[in-house]
Amino acid sequence: MERFASPFGTVELTAEREKHIFLFHPEVRKERKHFPSTLAEPEVIRRSRFDPKVFILYRAIVQGKYLAIVVKTNHRNFILTAYLTRNIQQL
């Protein structure tokens, strides 16, 4: 398990969640190095429309693309998934 600083405190990335991310979003593997900066200093944070304890943290990593990291906040903050996107979720 790896831990990262974030605006919500420490966030965990479990081996199971990392496996999920790389399986369903293989393009994220080469952008893994951007996880610490995206979590520590996101450019945009959006709350999920479906779960008030879930937030999406965005940070531009290449021209026109953002790394989006989805974090569940509760007694144990953890990463649900991560993906690349051209669009930031609208409020």
Please give the residue ranges for each predicted region.
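Ribonuclease/tRNase effector modules and their secretory precursors
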Residues: 1-91
